[in-house]
Swiss-Prot record:
Domain comment, as recorded: Based on x-ray crystallography data, the protein would be constituted of 4 tandem ACT domains instead of the 2 predicted from the sequence.
Lineage, top ranks: Eukaryota, Metazoa, Chordata, Craniata, Vertebrata
Function according to Swiss-Prot or TrEMBL: Functions as an intracellular arginine sensor within the amino acid-sensing branch of the TORC1 signaling pathway. As a homodimer or a heterodimer with CASTOR2, binds and inhibits the GATOR subcomplex GATOR2 and thereby mTORC1. Binding of arginine to CASTOR1 allosterically disrupts the interaction of CASTOR1-containing dimers with GATOR2 which can in turn activate mTORC1 and the TORC1 signaling pathway.
Stated family: Belongs to the GATS family.
Keyword Ubl conjugation: yes
Protein name: Cytosolic arginine sensor for mTORC1 subunit 1
Sites bearing Phosphoserine, chain numbering: S14
Pfam families in UniProt: ACT_7, CASTOR1_ACT-like, Castor1_N
Modification comment: Phosphorylation at Ser-14 by AKT1, promoting the interaction between CASTOR1 and RNF167.
Length: 329
């Protein structure tokens, strides 16, 4: 398998809901006029708490500082796994890289963020951790770093100043999980048809002002949650929204898999997770991989979100609760 270190240098930001008005214009520019901003990595996720942005340096320039904008200190690099094997159908999403990427990085105390899209899964690691990442994964992968759009082979020797942090850290924190009742769909869209849904997209993201129902509370089973994720990365669009929101969009323009599968969410974290703790993604992806359950995974500024097949949500909750009980004991 190949691991590609993409050229994007990404910043992770949070826009507070009361301050969204200040960022509507630059966000619309990034959404609909990417050539003007030269932004090639743009992701916007609405949650009950805030709007999380993952943007490259060109996109970051478009966002003015304000009291409503929080910026994570680190610059993040983007990793992507490609497999050329003609393997039989297997679990998709973060599950397929849980053992080969997520678990080893957690063992070596590398904090990761995940962004699953319709097309692929992006793994974000802090720039300062790159040497550790390469040393950790070089045995498993052929590693390439994109330079000027071309893949250049990378070896351990190229990053000889970093070595795996093999010391045992503290036991992973057991984070509570919630499963809201929404049913979600994962969709894509031909970028040429984006203008046709622009009005609806702007309304849903900026002007609907939906009130989250218990979503930010400590209730173990919130009835529903405000969640909408849009990404435009290297010309490819991915959208995650609940089935009710999808009804607002023209059905002939949004594309999904032939099965039209719906997904349920597992939300990770009772308090904001922060960026320093390692193993949060592994805590979820590992048990799902062991059970061969497909999952999309989207990290945000405060919490993490896994999407699993709707018909398997009961077994997923059972698997994760068993894992939590094991960690807590």
């Amino acid at each position: 398998m190949e691991l590609h270190i993409l050229e994007h240098r990404v910043r992770v930001l949070s826009v507070a809901r009361p301050g969204l008005w200040l960022y509507t214009h630059p966000l619309i520019k990034l959404l609909f006029l990417p050539r003007r901003s030269r932004c090639k990595f743009f992701s916007l996720t609405e949650t009950p708490e805030d709007y999380t942005l993952m943007v490259d340096e060109e996109g970051f320039k478009e966002l003015p500082p304000s009291e409503f904008l929080q910026v994570a200190e680190a610059t993040w690099l983007v990793l992507n796994v490609s497999s050329h094997s003609g393997a039989a159908v297997q679990a998709a999403g973060v599950t397929k890289i849980a053992r080969s990427v997520i678990a080893p990085l957690a063992e070596h105390h590398v904090s990761v963020l995940m962004l699953s899209t319709y097309q692929t899964d992006f793994i974000l690691v802090r720039e300062q951790d790159l040497s550790v990442v390469i040393h950790t994964l070089a045995q498993e992968f052929d590693i390439y770093r994109e330079v000027g759009g071309e893949p250049v082979p990378v070896t351990r020797d190229d990053f000889s100043n970093g070595f795996p942090r093999t010391q045992h850290g503290p036991s992973p924190t057991v984070h509570p999980i919630q499963s809201p009742q929404n049913r979600f769909c994962v969709l894509t869209l031909d970028p040429e048809t984006l203008p046709a849904i622009a009005t609806t997209l702007i309304d849903v993201l900026f002007y609907s002002h939906r009130t989250p129902k218990e979503a930010a509370s400590s209730s173990p089973e919130p009835s529903s949650i405000t969640f909408f994720a849009f990404s435009l990365i290297e010309g490819y669009i991915s959208i995650v929204m609940d089935a009710e929101t999808q009804k607002k969009f023209p059905s002939d323009l949004l594309l999904t898999s032939s099965s039209g599968e719906l997904w349920r969410m597992v939300r990770i974290g009772g308090q904001p997770l922060g960026f320093d703790e390692c193993g949060i993604v592994a805590q979820i992806a590992g048990p799902l991989a062991a059970a061969d359950i497909s999952a999309y995974y989207i990290s945000t500024f405060n919490f993490d979100h896994a999407l699993v097949p709707e018909d398997g949500i009961g077994s997923v909750i059972e698997v994760l609760q068993r894992r939590q009980e094991g960690l807590a004991s």
